[in-house]
Amino acid sequence: MEGQNKSITFDGREIRLTTGLYAPQANGSVMIECGDTSLLVTATKTTKKEVADFLPLICDYEEKLYAAGRIPGGFMRREGRPPERATLISRLIDRPMRPLFPSWMRDEIQIVASCLSLDERVPADVLAVTGASIATLLGEIPFHGPMAAVRVGLIGDDFILNPSYREIEKGDLDIVVAGSPDGIVMIEAGANQLSEQDTIEAIDFGYESVTELIKSQVDLLKDLGIKQVKSSAPEEDNTLPSYLEKNCTKGIELVLKKFDQSKDERDLELEKIKVDTQAKIESLKDDNELKVLLSENDKLLSSDFKKLTKKLMRSQIINDGKRVDGRELDEVRKISASAGILPKRVHGSALFQRGLTQVLSTTTLGTPSDAQEMDDLNPSTEKTYLHHYNFPPFSVGETRPMRTPGRREIGHGALAERAIIPVLPGKETFPYVLRVVSEVLSSNGSTSMGSVCGSTLSLLDAGVPLKALVSGTAMGLIKEGKEIRILTDIQGIEDFLGDMDFKVAGTEKGITALQMDMKITGLSVSVISDAIKKARPARLHILEKMQEAIDKPQESLSPHAPRLLSFRIDPELIGTVIGPGGRTIKGITERTNTKIDIEDGGIVTIASHDGAAAEEAQKIIEGLTRKVHEGEIFTGVVTRIIPIGAFVEILPGKEGMVHISQLSEARVERVEDVVRQGDEVTVRVREIDSRGRINLTLRGVSQNSGMSYPEPTPTPVAPLN
């Protein structure tokens, strides 16, 4: 077997491409490698036509743990359901690819990117996106590419192209920019309250690098003798569109200009026009051309009616500057927000509404043991902030079976999660694991940004000391020729019939998350810059409304939330706290009825529903890890008597022995003649031997002259859930 090997020198690195060797039955395939990261990307098209008004494109990213030299956990020791990370990368591939396929195309297309080897210095996701474009071009599938993606990081004042995982964690920016020859088609970003100007410069920096990769793909096709397929749309029968334009335009325009009507009223009126039109056509003679057309394709009327509605709505925005609800192009819908709407069994809650979009967000405070362990190729091993987004069918007035979260729900949840992470307190300040759930109760556009706002309010209601409040809005765009209109706070119909969905989240200081998807083949950096700048006043307006509901964290936590104490010990003394076989730490948890977690770095977190019990456990651990010095004097309790001496607990959990010869200046025959178990005595540290054992003495010590602590008593507390 022989393939063709090509290489691209990019940003001082070599990207290696192998074509014609792997997956010979796919339309196109490429092994794309950089460093030790290797991905096989395939593109396959079937000749089967889907009777639908959308492109049946499937993009899958697969990662196998053998790529990192690991064996999966669980009984089966085999990969199961794709982890969240794989789902997000699948979406990252789909989003820039979808707008570049011809709008008329209805063939089933599947792109599969399989990560076969992972180098932590070279993240696989942007390679997978670029590889998807190459595989599609090699498969000679109609495609308005090439398309490529790069990641941009920011450390200090310097932009870094395609940073490693470690550099991403250290930096203030993680942005993926994907583009075509026509411009940028997708953006995905997380940032540490970065200014709008710095964000725009990062996008510009990224797109410059994208153009280099696009040129490399053009050169690759030329070297392989492959001609890019850009077939034109098939000739369509204009009979029905002409009929609809003549008979429905006036009615649709009247509906779109009724600015005071609700979404349901508008939808009903448009549906009535369509139904009446269908009835007129069905009343025609059987051999009528229109009637024959509809009998052959029952979806044709809905499809062409939607196209006409789209055309008229866009024309109204371009020519009149008016949207279907009467708002100006830069106007935000009516906002209402409230916090603490549920009983405090729920640790934090909030309701956020913008127009007809309504989101209920709840916050749960958990202990470190509630952190989510990550069993994927991500170097991070656990998550301590979780955001889950749910989109039930009733939120759009529909009925369908309730399923597990789909790709869209996972993606929206991850975006809102990313927007909040930069403002979360550090572990040592607030050691709780946080889970926020956003329930979309009503949807009419921008539910993910509604979830960002709801999450912020809910976290504050739970008493989480956020560094700043975060709000978000979705920006839209209508492009007709050279005419461009940017829309602020788009609603459902503007998202559905528009050209862009650009979600911008951030604080008063700057941006924390971006997500841009296109329905056209690209936009210039200047247009994207304009959208980002116009999002800022909208975000600040929303922040003001949120602050009216709650502007700082609640002073006290819910009485039903666990109480946590967090402090640091010497990492070398972790074994002392745990004890042989875990006996010491188990004894502390049983004695105080608490949960104790110790991280490798020495951070100890104690959880209890009773603050006094947590403080008692902390005192014991600090006693175990406190260094004792010769000559120190303590007052403690005799815990055990043995023939040669007595053991005294000088600190919580730490004992020393008084040899029988050190009990008194005079000769002692029996230990019990001087002390008994339970007696309180004052002792001096005589020596600490080479094995760390503490030897004590009563000789020459005035009783009740040392440091003492009250004997701890078990405190009954409610069990942790």
UniProtKB/Swiss-Prot annotation:
One of its GO terms (molecular function) is magnesium ion binding. GO terms for biological process: mRNA catabolic process; RNA processing. SMART domains: KH (SM00322), S1 (SM00316). Transmembrane segments: none annotated. Residues 702-721 are annotated as: Disordered. It comes from the Bacteria. This is Polyribonucleotide nucleotidyltransferase. The gene is pnp.
